[in-house]
Amino acid sequence: MNNIITFLPFLSIFITGIFYPVGTYKHRPVFQPPNWFFSVAWTYITLSLGFITNKFINQQNNNNIKKNILTLFIFLLFLLNGWLVLNHYKLYKESFWLLIISCFTSIVYIIYLSSLNNLKNLIWFLLPLPFWLVLASCLNGVIYDYNK
């Protein structure tokens, strides 16, 4: 179970990306990072999300807390994978709002983990997730506005 949680975010987004690839856009926002940066950022974000979630679950003795962590974790993965599907079908408005919800969910997840009294130093490694989702929301918003 430990390795499944660690690699689940990476594998789920990788597999979803194979079935629902993100297309190229006619309009590229000026603040968009180069294409190679996306694979580096998502690899770090997904592996850190899985690794830190695994660490927190293994440190918990309370099954209710484990269940809460897993519920938020699975919901966040559902949102992140859902964006790929919506974006693939060019549902830009819906994918924009899904990114906003994903960003808020990631912040709730980080706050929940930081409320637990162990491993607080690992929370810092999750901070790129909401920042990246804010950037992705901005990029998606520009693409949505351009394609209206």
Language model regions located:
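Membrane-interface helix termini and inter-helical loops of multi-pass transporters
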Residues: V22-Q32, Q60-N62
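N-terminal membrane topogenic signal
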Residues: M1-L8
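Helix-adjacent hinge/juxtasegments
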Residues: T53-H88
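Terminal transmembrane helical module of multi-pass membrane proteins
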Residues: Y112-K148
